[in-house]
Each structure stands twice: as C-alpha cells, then as structure tokens.
C-alpha cells in the first residue's frame, strides 16, 4: 500500500483540516478517510475545491464534532443518509458514513442505506478514479487505498466504473451525464464498456429531476473544452433526452464555404471558441443555442444552397419553450433570447458599409449585453479558410472601434428618448395611449439615424416640430 503524504502540502488549509479530522477520529475511536475527487485531484495537480470525508461512524455526529473544532456554529445534516455538510469558509467540507445503497427499479432514490466498510463504500462510487481513499490516522497519514485500480485509470486517462457499468448507471442514471462531464473536465476517455452501457441506458436519464440534469449540462459548459462532453452526449444518445433541439442539429448540412458542413459541429466549435474567449457560463450557453432554430428554418435554394432565413427570430421564440423545460432562471432565459435574436446583426454590419445609424441600432438593441454579443460574434467565425478569417477579423475590429467611438459620443448603452412620456402628455394635453409611444419612437428613430443629438434640448425641439404630423396621422 503506497503513501501519498508527499502530495499533501503541509501549509495548506486542506492539510490542516485533514490532520484535525484524523486526530478527531482517534479521539472518538473511528477511522477517517478523505475520499473521491479530492484524492483524484491531488494526483492530477488540479485545484482542490472541497474535502469529502468518509467515517466509520455516524456521519452527522462526526460532522458536529469536527465543526466545533473548526469553530463553525451550524452544519447542514442529512440524517437519513448519515451525511452532513460543514459550511467552513476556507474550504467546503462534507462528511459521510461509509455506506452502500440499494435502489428500486425505475428510480434513482435509494430505498435502503446499509452501513458498510471502506471497500463496500468505494465500490458504490461512480468511477474508479473517484473510488480512492486516503487514511488520515496520524500513524498512517497519507496511506492510499485503491481497491479498484483507480490510480491505473488516472494514468491511462480512462473512466471506468468499479461495478459493472450497467449496474452503476441503472442505479443512478445521472452518472451517465457525469461521465461526459468528467471526460471534458479531465480530458479523459470513457471506457468502451461504459460507453456502450450509457448508449443502451440513455433513456433512463428521463427519471432524473430536470434541475439535476440542467446542473450537469451547465457543468459541461463550464469546462475548458465543452465540446468534448457535448459530443459524448450526442454520440451516446443522451442529447436526445437532455437537449433535443441540439440533437436535431446533428447531420444537417449547411453551406460549406463558411462553416463546418454539419450544423452540430459548427455549434460545437462556436462553444469552444466562446470558452476560449470568456469564462462566463451564460455566454457559453448562448453559443450553444445561437443557431437553435436552424433545423426548423433550413431550406434549399437552387442558387445559394441551404438557407436559414429568420433562424435568429425563430430561435428567440423557441428558447421560451427550452427555458421552461430546462427550468432556467428567467434572467438567463432573457439573456439567451436577446443574444440569439441579435447574433447576426454585427456580422451583417461587417458585410456592409459601416454607418453610424447601423452601429447605433445594434448598441441600443444589445444594451448591457453588447460586449457579450460581440464576443459571441467573434466565436461564431468558424470558417476554415484562413484568409477569410483574417478578413473577417479585420472588418470586425473596424466595427468594434467605430462602435466604441459612437457609444462614447452618443451615450447609447441605456438609450431611450430624452423626452419622457409624462412630459409629452403634459405638453400636448394628452392621456396615456399609442400617440405617446409614436412620438417617443419618432424621437428615438431620429437620434438613431443621426438627425438629432441624443440630448434633451434637441429632442424637445424635434418633438415640437413633428407633433402635428404624428398626431394627425
């Protein structure tokens, strides 16, 4: 049995907490281990984000005792599973009793929890690379327990299950999506038997709560190269159940000159580009859905080939349904709708003469999401022709420079008519109604077209000038 204490830096918070937990175990007469992702990430030299302890006693009682030593006043207990979370500011901690679980067919909720030994607990874990335990007893501190070959799989960059994969994924179907996540996050390959089992059981993901599924999808989008996980979802048949609108893109051709031949793989490239350009999960999500309506709007033109007229506007509407079944927050839904609707606008400016009026309209429409919109448009450049990429980027930089200039000069980001509705009503003796909206719209259009300045005096003068034309229309 090897000892990995040399991997545990002595001056870290994690090391101090582990040694404290080990001593507490001695005081209480119970073995304590650090398990799972923490051990895996020690070997991979990845950031250590949380500590999972396995204890050979009641998990809630041990968590209460450890929290007291850490001066944490309250824990979050789950007595049914003998598990508790300790909200320690320095690093999140979870404590669980060694256990195994049995499941009712068709459900991922355990019907029976049985306390077990170290090997029995590790056997129930999702992948062998997470079925690792380090002994924290002061006399054995750092001793590695690897009963199912996890270290060998870490070195091979391979995801395998401790149990037969059919049993592992049948018990908890969410593990199938987690396989895609770990493959993307760790740049690992899924074992052939596991891949086959996922493909055969893909439909069982339907029994998992939508909130859990969406959370795992978002975790995939948060990786350095999300396409790895997303392509696995498609290849295993999971995408059909997780996000059918994205699955519909697979195999649909589009114009070869500009993009990948396949809409799905073009989208994967856009998501990866967005991941390189930004850490924002919502922007990566926008990259995933920006062409969501292309399958619905795909037509064949005898001269142009495939066309997707209106896929931006149709996509905005489709996202209402998508956000509902994915149970996305309203704020994220509205963000995705806006960027999907507008994602062609900056590109259209690049392809035509760059006028101040066109720039103003994009700035006003995008509002606070302007920077994200421009980043999405950069990510959307996936042509394989390097000369076209160079030309596109040069034109794009011209647009961005002019946009910055116009925005600074005209203060348009939170644009609306400098003359407000109440003043219009008071000036002309009107009540609330469509006439007020018409006057405000006319003022805003004049500003966007460069006919008047974006300031109060010019707007009021223009209002008085056009009132008769608007009110007698």
Where are these regions (language model features)?
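Catalytic cores of the polymerase beta-like nucleotidyltransferase superfamily
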Residues: 1-473
């Amino acid at each position: 049995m090897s000892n990995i204490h040399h991997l545990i830096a002595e001056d870290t918070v994690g090391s101090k907490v582990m040694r404290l937990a080990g001593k507490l175990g001695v005081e209480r007469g119970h073995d304590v281990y650090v398990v799972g992702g923490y051990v895996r990430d020690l070997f991979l030299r990845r950031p250590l984000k949380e500590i999972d302890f396995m204890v050979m006693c009641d998990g809630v009682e041990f968590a209460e005792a450890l929290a007291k030593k850490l001066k944490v006043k309250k824990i979050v207990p789950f007595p049914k599973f003998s598990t508790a979370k300790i909200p320690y500011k320095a690093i999140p901690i979870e404590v669980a009793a060694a256990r195994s679980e049995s499941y009712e067919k068709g459900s991922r909720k355990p019907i029976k929890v049985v306390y077990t030994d170290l090997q029995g607990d590790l056997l129930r874990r999702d992948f062998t690379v997470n079925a690792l335990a380090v002994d924290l007893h002061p006399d054995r501190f750092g001793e590695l327990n690897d009963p199912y070959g996890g270290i060998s799989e870490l070195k091979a960059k391979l995801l395998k299950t401790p149990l037969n994969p059919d049993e592992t994924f049948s018990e908890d179907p969410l593990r199938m999506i987690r396989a895609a996540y770990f493959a993307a996050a760790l740049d690992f390959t899924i074992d052939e038997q596991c891949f086959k089992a996922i493909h055969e059981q893909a439909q069982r993901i339907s029994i998992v709560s939508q909130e859990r599924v969406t959370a795992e999808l978002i975790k995939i989008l948060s990786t350095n190269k999300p396409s790895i996980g997303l392509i696995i979802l498609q290849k295993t048949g999971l995408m059909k159940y997780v996000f059918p609108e994205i699955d519909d893109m697979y195999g649909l051709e589009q114009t070869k000159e500009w993009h990948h031949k396949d809409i799905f793989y073009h989208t994967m490239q856009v998501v990866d580009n967005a991941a390189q350009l930004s850490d924002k999960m919502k922007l990566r999500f926008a990259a995933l859905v920006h062409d969501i309506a292309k399958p619905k709007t795909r037509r064949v033109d005898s001269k142009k080939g495939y066309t997707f007229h209106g896929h931006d506007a149709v996509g905005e509407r489709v996202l209402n349904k998508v956000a509902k079944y994915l149970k996305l927050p309203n704020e994220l839904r509205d963000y995705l709708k806006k960027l999907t609707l507008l994602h062609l606008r900056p590109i259209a400016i690049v392809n035509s003469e760059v006028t101040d009026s066109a720039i103003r309209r994009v700035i006003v429409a995008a509002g606070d999401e302007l920077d994200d919109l421009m980043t999405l448009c950069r990510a959307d450049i996936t042509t394989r022709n390097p000369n076209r990429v160079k030309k596109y980027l040069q034109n794009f930089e011209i647009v961005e420079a002019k946009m910055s200039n116009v925005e600074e000069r005209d203060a348009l980001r939170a644009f609306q008519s400098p003359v407000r509705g109440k003043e219009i009503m008071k000036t002309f003796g009107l009540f609330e109604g469509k006439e007020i909206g018409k006057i405000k719209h006319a003022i805003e259009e004049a500003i966007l077209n460069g006919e008047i300045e974006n300031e109060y005096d010019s707007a009021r003068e223009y209002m008085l000038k056009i009132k008769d034309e608007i009110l007698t229309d």
